């Protein structure tokens, strides 16, 4: 993730972040406290709403596509290899996982 503009951690400011993926990445169900605007710049990104991951619900967004995810709406996604998306909105940018065990930054149990 690269910050393009603003500070995603500074409350009340506007931020723009860019995410590039090399391989395929599954994004488990989560939500954000603020509205999220997603634009596909390259490749494909698949998105769906709901609190349970269901690949059959994913809708493919191609370059130039834009989607708005309202604050607190549960959603999930799938990055195809080599895609680039840009996300902007009002900070702070925070990810709240529907299932905390899905958080990729969570320490692994020993």
Go through each PLM region and give its residues.
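A short glycine-rich, His/Asp/Glu-containing loop-to-beta-strand
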Residues: 1-29
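Divalent metal-coordination and catalytic microenvironments
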Residues: 4, 64, 85
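Short acidic-glycine-tyrosine-enriched beta hairpin
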Residues: 7-9, 24, 45, 51-72
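Glycine- and acidic-residue-biased ligand/ion/polar-headgroup-sensing regions
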Residues: 22-25, 31-52
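Histidine-centered active-site/metal-ligand motif
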Residues: 30-32, 74-75
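Active-site scaffold segments
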Residues: 37-39, 68, 84-88
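Double-stranded beta-helix
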Residues: 56-57, 76-110
């Amino acid at each position: 993730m690269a910050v393009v503009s603003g500070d995603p951690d500074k409350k009340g400011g506007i931020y723009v972040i860019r995410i590039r993926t090399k391989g395929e990445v599954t994004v488990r169900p989560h939500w954000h406290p603020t509205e999220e605007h997603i634009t596909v710049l390259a490749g494909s990104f698949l998105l769906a709403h709901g609190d349970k991951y269901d690949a059959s619900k994913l809708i493919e967004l191609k370059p130039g596509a834009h989607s708005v995810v309202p604050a607190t709406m549960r959603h999930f996604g799938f990055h195809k290899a080599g895609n680039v998306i840009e996300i902007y909105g009002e900070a702070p940018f925070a990810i709240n996982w529907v299932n905390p065990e899905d958080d990729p930054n969570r320490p692994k149990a020993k």
